[in-house]
Amino acid sequence: MRIAILGRPNVGKSSIFNRLCKRSLAIVNAQEGTTRDRLYGEIRAWDSIVHVIDTGGVDQESTDRFQKQIHKQALAAAEEASVLLLVVDIRCGITKQDEELAKRLLPLKKPLILVMNKADSQQDLQRIHEFYGLGISNMIATSASHDKHIDVLLERIRQVAEIPLPSAEEQENTQEEEFSSKESSVALHTFADETLFENESLSQEEASFLEELVAQTTTPSISNRPLKVALIGHPNVGKSSIVNALLKEERCITDNSPGTTRDNVDVSYTYNDKEYVFIDTAGLRKAKSIKNSVEWMSSSRTEKAISRADICLLVIDATQQLSYQDKRILSLIARYKKPHVILVNKWDLMFGVRMEHYVQDLRKMDPYIGQARILCISAKQRRNLSQIFSAVDDVYTIATTKLSTSLVNKVLAGAMQRHHPQVINGKRLRIYYAIHKTVTPFSFLLFINSNTLLTKPYELYLKNTLKAAFNLYGIPFDLEYKAKPARKSN
């Protein structure tokens, strides 16, 4: 079931959306027109998942150049939803825009609730009778800013949607299932007698230490949830155009001016029977370019989108040089250890340029780009878009695959045989065991004789060897080390 929240600008639609979803998904600001695209959230209640759609403020008299597209997006949400919430400002009384929206929504013959928001005081509640003229029988007064009567609104939604309440037995079973899933979500990767050097023996203390290391490793929990893919990039590189082209519909508002997208827009899509959630983000700007609080919140949410994504798509403009902002975004992706793919958009404007030469030059500009997969696409001409799904699936599959201990040790043993570590103070680095420790984020744990014998160049050599062996391009990973305990002298 889906609920659409509609209304004129600045009546508190996004505040109600955030209260219902119990998360700050939409930017809330006193500035009119803060929300532009359709935003999707979820209510988890009554043993059900109810999808909620926040829409931009509809004002047909506005001179805002985005208003025509906002109006189109709002009506699309109304058609898509099964329950409608028309939000008004109780302190302003009925406005012309409220009347126009009510006339548009009533003929849809869908359950419609009039939400009289901003009822912060008893004096505000005395104006309820003014809204009978809209012809909507289901009415409720709320104060989203003070979290008043949101629970009553939620119950009214359940009633008009005819969602049955779960029985006491079903609630108890749900709690037991949640507890069971938490217990089973932790699995240990075990191994026995898999040594890098077969003739190397371990003392009892070393064996106990190794068991402790194994207990620290994690394996990915199996999940059927959609894959979250964040499109990141500086303003006006075509992130929203890519989402629209992939979905083959005008799902996100696009414009030639930078900063059109403000909220993070989550868009669900199914491709080849696999579910994805594309997160269209506001472009990251330089700090000096952020002029108001809405832009600051947009940039902050972009970083949050990176943190909650399963995989990031960095979108750059083929017609422009790699910018400071592009490099900053790459560093953020690396900091959050997110698998990523580089999308070079607007390739239709690159006349007389060979793609392979462009990619070679691009790889030389930044060490992180040099290690990632690069796709040259055109959202405008829908060129090479299907490759995005293939690249995302390939990278994510590799990034979530647990590598066997024996295979990791075999690769490192070969690396050490091909290139011996240098001798330091008469001693040489030895690796006794190596474990693929975690998947998200990706990391390896090496059991070595001494940290002081590991040089930076040799560490880089080991990382490059693992990257090439397991195709970890575009997958940031760490090497962690534990020196074996010193043997006790008799």
UniProtKB/Swiss-Prot annotation:
Binding site for GTP 2: 233-240, 280-284, 345-348
GO biological process, one term: ribosome biogenesis
Sample GO molecular function, one term: ribosome binding
Residues engaged in binding GTP 1: 7-14, 54-58, 117-120
Chain ranges of the EngA-type G domain: 1-165, 227-400
Functional note: GTPase that plays an essential role in the late steps of ribosome biogenesis.
InterPro entries per the UniProt record, alphabetical: G_ENGA, GTP-bd, GTPase_Der, KH_dom-like, KH_dom-like_a/b, P-loop_NTPase, Small_GTP-bd
Subunit (UniProt): Associates with the 50S ribosomal subunit.
Family affiliation: Belongs to the TRAFAC class TrmE-Era-EngA-EngB-Septin-like GTPase superfamily. EngA (Der) GTPase family.
Location of the region described as Disordered in the Swiss-Prot/TrEMBL record: 165-184
UniProt keyword annotation of Cell cycle present: no
Protein's recorded name: GTPase Der
Species: Chlamydia muridarum (strain MoPn / Nigg)
Domain KH-like, chain residue ranges per copy: 401-485
UniProt feature, compositional bias: Acidic residues: 169-178
PANTHER family reported for this sequence: GTPASE DER
NCBIfam families: GTPase_EngA, small_GTP
Keywords from the named record: GTP-binding, Nucleotide-binding, Repeat, Ribosome biogenesis
